[in-house]
Amino acid sequence: LSTARLAAAVANEGGIGLIAASGMPTDELRYEIRLARSLTSGIIGINIMVAARGFSEIVKTAIEEGIDLVVAGAGFSRDMFGLGQESGTPIVPIVSSVKLAKISQRLGAAAIVVEGKEAGGHLGTSTSIRELIPDIAKAVDIPVVAAGGVLSGQDIVDLIKMGASGVQMGSRFAASEESNAAPALKRFYLKSKPDDIVVIHSPVGLPGRAVRNPFADKIMVGPVPPKGCKAC
């Protein structure tokens, strides 16, 4: 949902705009990065799932395009730190434990995103972000960015008081004008109620929070065989 327009809009307001790069063809990624650069002079990065097909190629392409940072979650890759060090590109892993936070710092992470159980999408913990932040902030010396269920200014204030250096927000912008989501998906999202939020077992092998839909209903019953899935 976050392509050049949304990333640039966030960057223009002083944030770090992230392009969702998971599964994106490299030529499309180059286009989105260049488009974002034409729309802002702010900081632009990519967010990518380590579990996604073509992870290394996507990271290398983004680095070739001069991306400002790489944020990576849904798995953990030691190799990405080497790519970052070779090019001088900050690598920011998404973690959910003190142990992985310490490992990330040791491997050369520029910062870490700490994601709690409240997050949308793939989940790495059953612990609340408000429980994770104080412990992890004390355990490392690099910036700690809180993520998961951050919806308001008060949430930001609370998390910074707990030790976070900043926050990452995703779902809050899913239905924004700049979001790349289809209008029908935005309407579906806005009409959803709290009871419509479910946790499924994602096709990449991780639990994930989603808005209830026919596919989510099927996958909660059991594995759904892919039809024509490339590289499964």
Predicted regions and their residues:
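Active-site entrance/lid segments in N-terminal catalytic domains of soluble metabolic enzymes
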Residues: 1-143
